[in-house]
Amino acid sequence: MFLVCLMASGLVSCASTTEPESVSTAPREIVISVEDQKLALMEAGQPVAVYPVSTSKFCLGDTPNSYGTPLGRLKVAQKIGSHAPMGAVFKNRQPTGEILPPNAPGRDPIVTRILRLTGQEHGNARTFARNIYIHGTPEESTIGRPASFGCVRMTSQDVVDLYNRIPSGTQVHITKNRLPSSARLWARRQGRSSAPAAGKTPAPAIVASIPKPMDQAQGPIIAHSHFSPPAP
């Protein structure tokens, strides 16, 4: 579902490339639990990494202008920001040149990396047009509880790590239910079973040491007319 984008001059553009994509031994899947406010990267049914996240503070679903986080089966359609520095601000998926530190007062833009999602089911078919992303946020103190405008927010450190571990087209499952038991056990063992206290930035994700896939573009994405939610 997610297109992989080329890296050029610190800006990602979707285009063809002659570089081959490395193939992992098993397909990876992203599972996002609204109840747990966590994202698990799974491979062959086992967790590779577990990260705290923040989903919508408004609702769940795919209704236009609702600021809801969509549920169901999706995939990564685009990867944007490959060479951007930590805290790089994006507007309309383009870097502005501004860089923000974590928890910059009064600021809530999209930062660091963008994984643009597209839906695969009737109930999330508007996801791409609604500009729903997995992305970095400077509001890292809100990670671990619902606080977004529909997107799935991560710390800058965590979104870079996830970005580097998956190719475009990676399957995503967003569910109201809890993470798989193996991922919950992983998180408990690594001390990531609870949300951070108010005003605190969550600890970095605990990840397994596995090879990271090379990114490869899979062609341009057709432009859509869409509504752009403020600071998802």
Regions found by a protein language model. Give the residues of each.
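A structural motif detector for short, solvent-exposed N-terminal "entry" segments of globular domains
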Residues: T18-L60
